[in-house]
């Protein structure tokens, strides 16, 4: 497995790659499948399930219990169980062999599973998907006890051979999925599917419940660790093979990995991807389905499954599967993007294929469509969803492999993919091509006639191979490389554009999009694989960028771009965004009306959006394309346009053209400033600066702006003088201002004349009306009061006279929005006591689905089930606050038979409210209900109430309007309320039903004066001057308040009388008379109370002036908070003050000193603020500091309390005679020291008194009771005009008078108290004398108190509504959020020990109120010393001295409090009684606190007096109303004047227009007469012209004929020249072909000759041992040359065909001319050559000599540019087939490297060949000659011997001590020197060049293998111009690489350094390399 390679596959592996049959072997006959599952169930029943059988026989209701236990589990766990059961059901169908045993289900690694991929037919796949839909039903209703119980029953029947077909179909119907039943009907036999589903689910649910089996863990334990490791290893190898494009091998590895880990969905997904590449779409479909079943939330599995369906032609099926996948994978944002893209692609494919059919095989069509795509194409494919697939990946690029069955696989080139990693996450790709067919027109794939034959497949493959090979040319790669660069640039520009747009860099974005649009042609957009919508999105991006810039020019261009989208691209679906963009443009221009029109159009086009779009070539989503976001944005814009801001100015120029609007805003894009001209009559005339300049030029002769001062106002009919001119600059600032003060004469105001009644009859009518109104008001109040009392009596059930009801229970009641739920909560204990059968109630609530199965199980699991069930249900209702469930609970209560008769009428009365409200509701909203989709309502009804009230299928909405269907009608309203999100039009109607109709209540306005109107504040009496006081709403009971209809209708006679008697400047119309009277009465009332501008009142009462100013500034500071004296508010308001007010402020020394003269104002940080605001700020700071101190002290105190031992002998532990009484939340005031008791009579009188003075003060008092009466600790606080201090302020004040026993809603206004709902609670049944004061030690802790209080008065105001008395105080130092409950048990200790409250315990428990006795202590309330210290310190500022009472504090244990007083010592702090009360530290601390409290008492009194003043100031709020009414009157008069002036102006304008029109008519008449005369003259002149036109037309016709003739001749000439050009190009290509073929044939002939000579020499193997090896090399070389000849011929023929088809020679790619090198062979010994020269051809010897010395190059193969010689590329054959050529190339490359750069491997190869060529012993001279013959093949052995002799003579006949290499080097240098001395000879240039080149190589190579690997030598016929340099990048003289451009290139092509060439020219005048004398060169 480790060394896995091609050719090494085993037989088993080959079998895996075979073509699998189409027939599916996993779903066979239904009988067998059913038997398989029934056998599984029987096995369970015979073994493990036998106990369940026996138990089922003994217990009939076992399914119900199993169902309850199953449904009691969390929903998430149940859904996981359902997924596991689904795997168990599908395991035999998709993953396992048919005949596998039951053991293999539990141990997949033991038995062989179906790892081998099997195809699934489309019919079988339909059955599988239907089965999957049925199985998924159970997951939807996993926690529905009704349906799960039915499932278990059906499974039980099937297992017992009972036919339950009808039950099964009904079960599926009740689940609500209406799509499955038609599918089941289309299946021939659906019973096997249903039996499998119900039996398997019943089997597994029973296992989970009875055996406590965890299906998830059981499924995960199937694979052992070894299997997991092996599977992971196989997967990694498969990933590697996939990245290498070896998909067949990757399939084998993935298959083996699946054998080890069959539950891994990634493996099936990877294998499906491989099958897609291989073209095996059915196998891919099977694996995709398996991956989905294993994990249905994996997006890639769904993607590949849809791809396989698409490749099979099932486009609609694939689209439906994609929609289902998006719903399942909605929590995966990355995966959902790819699925959305696939969805768009499928939709477009279906649209493209509409109306077109094809009978081709889809795979064959796929090959044909992809045949002409080049293999190595790098052009990226653009995704349909506008996402560009990046081709620059870190992995190797892979290609698609497609096959038409079995192992006949064909590679089809496509875009490269990113290889899978360990878990194999390749990118999603669209299929490479789609067959042009549609699902509706295709036949079954199983049709054998459609399968192509094997011969057709072979021919198809051969054609495809030839086509692909033709495309693998250099030009093709270059073209696609250019395409890739273009797309890269495109992506870069788009990314720059949208990135800049997201970063608000609009100019950069506009630049990028503009550059992009300039380069894109919409007509050629498809050539870039882009859709037209991509181009439109680029246009949209440019428009948005220009819009963001916001300048006028850019806005106009943006508007044009948006209009371009609408006009030219309406089919792309972006009209909505375009209209929205135009609206934004107009909104930027502040043209709100035009913007509103476009926004409205955009709202209507939201549905046309194509979906969520992304920027082209990216994954970045365009946020505006989200429909929900567009909708919200448009609604916001529409709201802004409907209510535009007030313009800063309005241009009055009649010819204003400022962006088609006269409104001037500072935010206008073209805003350039404006001018405002004001006159003394308060006229304001404004102009654009451009309009003002035009007006001055045309009307005022360019008058200077300043000269307009003191001129006449520009307003028509205004006689005022211009007094002020303000010019605003383009920045909105005041540029310059001119002002001239005009003293306006004060005209006395015209007195208001009241119309007096002219007759006594009218006076009598008025008095009668007043009397009637008063009587009606009193009757309405009385009626409302009676109904309120009646309803409250009904809402309060009969009481069982239980005086022990605790007052703390009232404090637990919170105010709820639902009044029915509030009533149930208040009477929870009564309801609990009357419900006798709790189990029946719970079952009914469970059936009505008020309680879930989990809640029902929780109730039953409780030990105290009977007593706590009702409490649990009510608490559950309060927690959910569901109005429907509350009323269902009330309905169930009313239907119970076993109910206490005392409470039954009350419950039935509450329940009947809803039934009574049905009629009015349907009468009012019947039309809206009839517009509903009743089919949807029917489905919802069957789901919710079908099992209780029956189905309403077949009925109409009119059925609910019948009186007999009141219950069903109410249930219908309940159903609409529960699904109100689906019926948005009924929200208000449903709220009205539940808030008003169903829970009857009336909100009345409580008036302090009985003479004021009751319903609303409407003043109809002119003479009534008294202002009504602030109304206080009062919540009363059931019933609707009705006011008697007013009988004020005026008869027509009265109207006539009024009209006749009316006096005044004008008569008021009848329809306005009543409104005018009301307005005048209201105005007279306000003006009579506060006359601001009445000088007499100002002079009479100067204090009232100051008081009014103080009120005004108080209101200003209340609205805006503390303000700086330099604030703009003061300066602006001061400008409008009258002169008298300014004088008052100037006398006081300014505004600041004036305000400080009033105690209401203070200065804080140079800001004026109200004193009460300052006190709040100080208290907040003080509170923060105090809390910090409390925390520190509490920590220290806790440490001292716990860690430090107490000293019992200390002085502080002695009993203290005077104990301080403190309350945590209520402060006490000093009282007489000798008053130790208070009589009950005084107490009663104090309670009954209505006075706010006397004994009741603003602070609560602490009293000490007599020993024989209950100890009063705190007296109830009565209302006072001064507010309570913040430290001990009651949240709601108690009323001083008694009220009846009902709940009243009293929001308190004023007094600085937070306004929250308050309720006056009272217990009428309790005595006022026995329950007012409660002993502190006996306060019950059953209900946790909201505040730590030592007293619970019986009658106070609180925010709790109950029939019992309760007190609720709020202190700012306590956090109300932590009120409930964890410190109640410690409150007694805190109050006794820490605060020192003196408590006199009762003698026995009987003396105390039994209802207040404390039950068993709660352990969770165990002590808190932190709360002790905190409570003691929070009220430091609020404590005062209290009268002392001699007592001994007693420590009470927490566990003993509820029984009686515990007098035992408390260990370990107490050894005897009273020790703990003498704590040293606490007493000292309390004394300090008392001192501080006494010192702060005076400050508190001052503060309270200040607050009293604040309350008095609040009574003067009518000043504000006076100002408002006066302002409104002024506005009314101004509007009237403005309208009159406007009418007058319009009248003048109309008259002027009329005059202008008359003048214009006269002018038109005159001009018409003149034009008629001119026309007569023109007619006379034009009469001869028609004759002349005939001559012109004939001349033009002749010219046209000549032009057409010349065009025809030109076309003929063009055709002839084109044919000649084609013939010429064809002849050129034929000549090139002949030349190349001749070259190769020459090489072939030479090779044949040499091969022939080698064969002749093969007889003498001793002399030439390697002759056989050389013969084989030359034969291989000869065959290669012949193949190359054929290849060149075919290439030239293709080019000739292309030329004939219309292509141009310049556009075609040139034929690659590869150089052919002879193979390297061993050198023939000179002896052999000399011996054979006598009987061999001399030419042959020369040929052999030249070929063995160097590689032969044909002269025709040399390039014309003289480029340096390189190693030739061989395009024929592969390295494995031609080892000789590879060896030759390696040796040649090694020989061209310097000795220092040669590698050891090259040396080894060279030395190896040298040893092979020199195996026989040789003489040194022969070896030297042999070396030299290789270097200088042009010299004979005799000539070389002569050179050796010359060198020996120079060295004085001594070669001793020199090696052969050194001798060869010296001889080589001598030969080169000899050649340089000779003159250049054209006939010998070749030999000189060869010698020089050979010498250079010899110098650079010192090793013996030079004999076998010398440099390339030229043939004798080679030209000197074609001799290349050794290296094109190095100097020919010094052989150094050119590092700069300082070089010289000769005409012959050789290159030299300029310095080297200058040195050479000093002694020579020829080319150093070729000896050319032509030295003309080019730089």
UniProtKB/Swiss-Prot annotation:
This is E3 ubiquitin-protein ligase TTC3. Phosphorylation on Ser-378 by Akt is required for ubiquitin ligase activity. PANTHER family: E3 UBIQUITIN-PROTEIN LIGASE TTC3. Its EC number is 2.3.2.27. SMART domains: RING (SM00184), TPR (SM00028). Residues 1-230 are annotated as: Interaction with POLG. E3 ubiquitin-protein ligase which catalyzes the formation of 'Lys-48'-polyubiquitin chains. Mediates the ubiquitination and subsequent degradation of phosphorylated Akt (AKT1, AKT2 and AKT3) in the nucleus. Acts as a terminal regulator of Akt signaling after activation; its phosphorylation by Akt, which is a prerequisite for ubiquitin ligase activity, suggests the existence of a regulation mechanism required to control Akt levels after activation. It comes from Mus musculus. Residues 1788-1799, 1808-1821 have a biased composition (Polar residues). It catalyses: S-ubiquitinyl-[E2 ubiquitin-conjugating enzyme]-L-cysteine + [acceptor protein]-L-lysine = [E2 ubiquitin-conjugating enzyme]-L-cysteine + N(6)-ubiquitinyl-[acceptor protein]-L-lysine. Interacts (when phosphorylated on Ser-378) with AKT1, AKT2 and AKT3 (when phosphorylated). Interacts with CIT. Interacts with POLG. Interacts with HSP70. Interacts with SMURF2. TPR repeats lie at residues 231-264, 266-298, 536-572, 576-609. Residues 1214-1227, 1576-1586, 1873-1890 have a biased composition (Basic and acidic residues). A zinc finger (RING-type) spans 1931-1971. It is found in: Nucleus; Cytoplasm; Golgi apparatus. Pathway: Protein modification; protein ubiquitination. It is an enzyme of class 2 (transferase). Residues 1036-1050, 1248-1257 have a biased composition (Low complexity). GO terms for molecular function: ubiquitin-protein transferase activity; zinc ion binding. Keywords: Cytoplasm, Golgi apparatus, Metal-binding, Nucleus, Phosphoprotein, Repeat, TPR repeat, Transferase, Ubl conjugation pathway, Zinc, Zinc-finger. InterPro entries: DEATH-like_dom_sf, TPR-like_helical_dom_sf, TPR_rpt, TTC3/DZIP3-like_helical, TTC3/DZIP3/RBM44-like_helical, TTC3/DZIP3_dom, wHTH_TTC3, Znf_RING. GO terms for biological process: negative regulation of axon extension; negative regulation of neuron differentiation; protein K48-linked ubiquitination; ubiquitin-dependent protein catabolic process. GO terms for cellular component: Golgi apparatus; nucleus; vacuole. CDD domains: RING-H2_TTC3 (cd16481). Residues 422-457, 783-811, 1021-1067, 1214-1289, 1402-1427, 1574-1601, 1757-1776, 1788-1821, 1873-1927 are annotated as: Disordered. Its main location: nucleus. The modification Phosphoserine is found at residues 378, 1009, 1060, 1794.
């Amino acid at each position: 497995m480790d060394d896995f390679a091609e050719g090494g596959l085993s037989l088993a592996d080959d079998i895996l790659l075979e073509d699998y049959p189409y027939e599916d072997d996993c779903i066979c006959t239904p009988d067998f499948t059913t038997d398989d599952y029934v056998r599984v169930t029987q096995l369970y029943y015979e073994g493990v399930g036998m106990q369940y059988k026996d138990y089922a026989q003994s217990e009939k209701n076992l399914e119900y219990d199993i169902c309850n236990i199953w449904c009691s589990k969390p929903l998430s766990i149940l859904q996981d169980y359902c997924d596991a059961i689904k795997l168990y059901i599908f395991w035999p169908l998709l993953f396992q062999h048919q005949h596998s045993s039951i053991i293999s289900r539990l141990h997949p690694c033991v038995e062989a599973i179906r790892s081998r991929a099997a195809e699934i037919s489309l019919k079988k796949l339909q059955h599988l998907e239907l089965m999957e839909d049925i199985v998924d039903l159970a997951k939807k209703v996993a926690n529905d006890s009704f349906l799960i119980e039915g499932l278990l029953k059906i499974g039980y029947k099937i297992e017992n051979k009972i036919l339950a077909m009808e039950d099964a179909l009904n079960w599926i119907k009740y689940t609500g999925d209406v799509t499955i039943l038609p599918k089941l009907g289309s299946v021939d036999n659906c019973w096997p599917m249903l039996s499998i589903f119900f039996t398997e689910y019943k089997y597994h649910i029973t296992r989970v419940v009875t055996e406590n089996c965890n299906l998830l863990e059981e499924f995960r334990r199937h694979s052992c660790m070894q299997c997991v490791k092996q599977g992971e290893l196989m997967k990694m190898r498969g990933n590697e093979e996939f990245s290498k494009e070896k998909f067949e091998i990757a399939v084998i590895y993935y298959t083996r990995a699946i054998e080890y880990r069959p539950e891994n969905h990634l493996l099936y997904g990877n294998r499906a991807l491989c099958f897609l590449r291989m073209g095996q779409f059915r196998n891919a479909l099977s694996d995709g389905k398996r991956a989905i079943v294993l994990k249905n939330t994996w997006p890639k599995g769904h993607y590949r499954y849809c791809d396989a369906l698409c490749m099979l032609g099932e486009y609609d099926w694939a689209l439906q599967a994609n929609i289902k996948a998006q719903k399942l994978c909605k929590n995966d944002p990355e995966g959902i993007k790819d699925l959305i893209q696939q969805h768009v692609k499928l939709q477009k494919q279906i649209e493209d294929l509409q109306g077109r059919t094809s009978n081709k095989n889809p795979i064959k069509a796929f090959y044909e469509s992809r045949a002409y795509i080049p293999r190595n194409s790098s052009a990226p494919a653009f995704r349909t969803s506008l996402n560009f697939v990046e081709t620059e990946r870190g992995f190797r690029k892979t290609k698609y492999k497609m096959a038409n069955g079995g192992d006949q696989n064909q590679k089809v080139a496509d875009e490269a993919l990113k290889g899978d990693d360990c878990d194999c996450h390749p990118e999603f790709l669209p299929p490479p091509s789609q067959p042009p067919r549609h699902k509706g027109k295709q036949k079954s794939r199983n049709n054998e006639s459609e399968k192509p034959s094997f011969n057709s497949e072979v021919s198809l493959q051969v054609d495809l191979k030839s086509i692909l090979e033709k495309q693998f040319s250099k030009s093709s790669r270059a073209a696609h490389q250019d395409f890739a660069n273009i797309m890269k640039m495109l992506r870069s520009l788009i990314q720059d554009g949208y990135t800049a747009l997201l970063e608000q860099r609009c100019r950069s974005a506009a630049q990028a999009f503009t550059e992009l649009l300039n380069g894109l042609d919409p007509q050629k957009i498809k050539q870039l694989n882009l859709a037209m919508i991509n181009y439109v999105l680029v246009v949209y991006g440019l428009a948005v960028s220009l819009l963001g810039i916001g300048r006028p020019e850019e806005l106009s261009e943006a508007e044009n771009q948006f209009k371009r989208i609408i006009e030219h691209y309406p089919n792309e679906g972006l009209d909505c965004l375009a209209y929205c963009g135009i609206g934004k443009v107009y909104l930027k221009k502040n043209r709100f009306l035009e913007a509103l029109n476009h926004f409205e159009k955009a709202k209507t086009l939201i549905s046309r959006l194509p979906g969520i779009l992304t920027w082209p070539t990216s994954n970045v989503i365009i946020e505006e394309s989200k429909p929900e976001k567009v909708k919200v944005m448009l609604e916001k814009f529409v709201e802004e346009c409907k209510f535009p801001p007030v313009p800063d100015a309005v241009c009055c120029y009649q010819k204003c053209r400022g962006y088609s609007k006269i409104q001037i805003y500072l935010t206008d894009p073209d805003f350039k400033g404006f001018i405002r001209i004001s006159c003394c009559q308060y006229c304001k005339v404004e102009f654009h600066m451009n309009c003002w300049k035009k007006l001055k030029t045309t009307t005022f002769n360019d008058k200077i702006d300043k000269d307009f001062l003191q001129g006449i106002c520009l307003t028509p009919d205004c006689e005022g003088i211009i007094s002020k001119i303000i010019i605003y600059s383009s920045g909105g600032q005041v540029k310059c201002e001119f002002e001239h003060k005009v003293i306006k004469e004060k005209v006395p105001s015209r007195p208001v004349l009241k119309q007096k009644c002219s007759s006594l009859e009218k006076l009598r009518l008025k008095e009668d009306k007043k009397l009637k109104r008063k009587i009606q008001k009193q009757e309405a109040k009385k009626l409302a009061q009676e109904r309120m009392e009646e309803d409250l009596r009904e809402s309060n059930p009969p009481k069982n006279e239980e005086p022990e009801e605790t007052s703390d229970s009232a404090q637990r009641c919170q105010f709820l929005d639902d009044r029915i739920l509030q009533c149930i909560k208040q009477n929870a204990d009564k309801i609990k006591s009357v419900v006798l059968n709790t189990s029946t109630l719970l079952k009914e609530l469970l059936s009505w689905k008020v309680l879930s199965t989990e809640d029902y199980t929780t109730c039953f699991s409780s030990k105290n089930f009977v007593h706590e069930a009702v409490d649990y249900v009510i608490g559950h209702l309060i927690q959910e606050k569901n109005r429907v469930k509350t009323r269902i609970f009330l309905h169930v209560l009313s239907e119970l038979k076993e109910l206490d008769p005392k409470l039954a009428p009350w419950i039935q009365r509450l329940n009947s409210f809803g039934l009574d409200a049905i009629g009015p509701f349907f009468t009012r909203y019947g039309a809206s209900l009839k517009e509903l989709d009743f089919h949807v309502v029917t489905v919802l009804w069957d789901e919710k109430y079908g099992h209780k009230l029956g189905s309403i299928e077949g009925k109409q909405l009119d059925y609910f309007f019948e009186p007999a269907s009141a219950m069903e009608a109410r249930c219908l309203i309940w159903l609409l309320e529960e699904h109100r999100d689906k019926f948005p039009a009924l929200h208000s109607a449903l709220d009205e039903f539940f808030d008003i109709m169903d829970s009857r209540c009336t909100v009345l306005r409580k008036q302090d004066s009985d003479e004021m109107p009751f319903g609303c504040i409407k003043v109809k009496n002119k003479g009534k001057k008294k202002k009504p006081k602030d109304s206080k709403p009062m919540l009363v009971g059931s019933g609707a308040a009705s006011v008697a209809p007013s009988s004020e209708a005026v008869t027509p006679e009265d109207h006539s009388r009024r009209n006749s008697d009316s006096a005044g400047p004008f008569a008021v119309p009848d329809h306005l008379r009543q409104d005018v009277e009301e307005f005048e009465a209201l105005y007279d009332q306000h003006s009579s109370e506060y006359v601001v501008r009445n000088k007499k009142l100002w002079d009479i009462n100067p204090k009232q002036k100051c008081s009014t100013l103080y009120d005004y500034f108080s209101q200003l500071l209340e609205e805006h908070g503390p303000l700086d004296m330099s604030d703009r508010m003061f300066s602006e308001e001061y400008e409008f003050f009258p002169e008298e007010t300014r004088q008052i402020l100037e006398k006081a020394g300014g505004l600041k000193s004036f305000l400080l003269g009033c105690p209401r104002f203070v200065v804080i940080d140079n800001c004026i603020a109200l004193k009460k605001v300052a006190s709040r700020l100080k208290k907040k700071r003080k509170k923060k500091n105090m809390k910090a101190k409390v925390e520190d002290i509490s920590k220290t105190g806790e440490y001292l309390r716990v860690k430090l031992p107490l000293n019992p002998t200390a002085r502080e532990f002695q009993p203290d005679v005077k104990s301080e009484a403190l309350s945590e939340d209520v402060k006490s005031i000093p009282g007489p020291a000798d008053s130790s008791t208070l009589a009950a009579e005084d107490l009663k009188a104090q309670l009954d008194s209505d006075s706010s003075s006397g004994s009741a003060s603003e602070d609560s008092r602490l009293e000490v009771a007599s020993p024989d009466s209950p100890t009063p600790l705190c007296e109830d606080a009565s209302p006072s005009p001064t507010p309570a201090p913040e430290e001990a302020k009651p949240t709601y004040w108690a009323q001083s008078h008694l009220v009846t026993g009902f709940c009243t809603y009293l929001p308190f206004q004023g007094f600085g108290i937070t306004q929250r709902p308050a309720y006056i609670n009272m217990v009428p049944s309790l005595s006022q004398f026995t329950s007012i004061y409660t002993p502190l030690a006996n306060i019950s802790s059953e209900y946790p108190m909201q505040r730590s209080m030592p007293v619970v008065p019986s009658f106070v105001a609180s925010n709790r509504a109950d029939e019992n008395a309760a007190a609720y105080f709020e202190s700012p130092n306590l956090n109300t959020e932590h009120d409930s409950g964890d410190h109640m048990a410690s409150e007694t200790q805190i109050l006794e020990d820490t605060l020192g409250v003196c408590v006199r315990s009762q003698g026995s428990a009987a003396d105390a109120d039994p209802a207040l006795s404390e039950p068993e202590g709660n352990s969770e309330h165990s002590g808190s010393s932190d709360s002790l210290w905190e409570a003691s310190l929070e009220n430091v500022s609020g404590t005062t001295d209290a009268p002392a009472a001699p007592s001994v504090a007693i420590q009470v244990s927490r566990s003993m409090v509820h029984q009686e007083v515990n007098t035992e010592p408390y260990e370990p702090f107490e050894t005897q009684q009273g020790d703990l009360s003498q704590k040293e530290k606490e007493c000292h601390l309390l004394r300090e606190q008392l001192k501080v409290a006494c010192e702060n008492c005076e400050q508190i009194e001052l503060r309270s007096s200040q607050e009293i003043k604040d309350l008095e100031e609040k009574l003067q709020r009518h000043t504000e109303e006076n100002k408002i009414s006066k302002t409104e009157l002024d506005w009314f008069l101004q509007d009237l004047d403005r309208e009159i002036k406007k009418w007058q102006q319009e009248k003048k304008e109309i008259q002027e227009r009329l005059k202008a029109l008359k003048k214009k008519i006269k002018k038109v008449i005159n001009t018409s007469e003149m034009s008629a005369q001119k026309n007569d003259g023109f007619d006379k002149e034009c009469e001869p012209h028609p004759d002349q036109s005939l001559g012109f037309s004939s001349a033009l016709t002749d010219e046209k004929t000549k032009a057409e003739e010349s065009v025809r001749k030109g076309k003929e000439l063009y055709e002839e020249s084109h044919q000649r050009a084609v013939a010429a190009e064809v002849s050129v290509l034929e000549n090139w072909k002949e030349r190349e073929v001749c070259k190769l044939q020459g090489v072939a002939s030479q090779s044949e000759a040499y091969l022939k000579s080698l064969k002749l020499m093969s007889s003498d193997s001793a002399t030439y041992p390697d002759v056989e090896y050389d013969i084989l090399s030359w034969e291989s070389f000869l065959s290669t040359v012949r193949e190359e000849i054929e290849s060149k011929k075919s290439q030239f023929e293709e080019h000739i065909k292309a030329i004939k088809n219309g292509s141009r020679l310049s556009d075609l790619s040139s034929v690659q001319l590869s150089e052919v090198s002879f193979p390297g062979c061993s050198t023939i010994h000179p002896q052999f050559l000399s011996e054979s020269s006598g009987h061999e051809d001399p030419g042959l010897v020369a040929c052999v000599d030249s070929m063995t010395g160097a590689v032969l190059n044909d002269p025709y193969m040399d390039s014309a540019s003289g480029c340096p010689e390189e190693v030739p590329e061989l395009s024929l054959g592969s390295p494995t087939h031609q080892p000789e050529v590879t060896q030759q190339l390696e040796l040649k490359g090694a020989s061209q490297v310097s000795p220092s750069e040669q590698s050891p491997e090259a040396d080894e190869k060279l030395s190896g060949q040298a040893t092979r060529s020199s195996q026989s012993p040789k003489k040194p001279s022969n070896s030297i000659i042999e070396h030299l013959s290789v270097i200088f093949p042009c010299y004979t052995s005799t000539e070389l011997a002569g050179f050796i002799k010359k060198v020996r003579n120079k060295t004085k006949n001594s070669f001793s001590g020199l090696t052969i290499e050194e001798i060869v080097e010296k001889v080589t240098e001598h030969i080169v020197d000899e050649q340089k001395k000779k003159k250049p000879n054209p006939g010998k240039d070749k030999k000189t060049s060869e010698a020089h080149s050979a010498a250079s190589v010899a110098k650079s190579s010192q090793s013996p293998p030079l004999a076998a690997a010398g440099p390339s030598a030229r043939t004798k016929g080679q030209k000197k111009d074609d001799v290349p340099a050794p290296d094109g990048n190095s100097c020919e003289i010094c052989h150094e690489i050119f590092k700069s451009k300082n070089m010289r290139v000769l005409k012959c092509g050789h290159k030299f350094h300029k310095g080297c060439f200058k040195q050479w020219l000093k002694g020579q005048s020829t080319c150093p390399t070729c000896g050319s004398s032509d030295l003309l060169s080019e730089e």
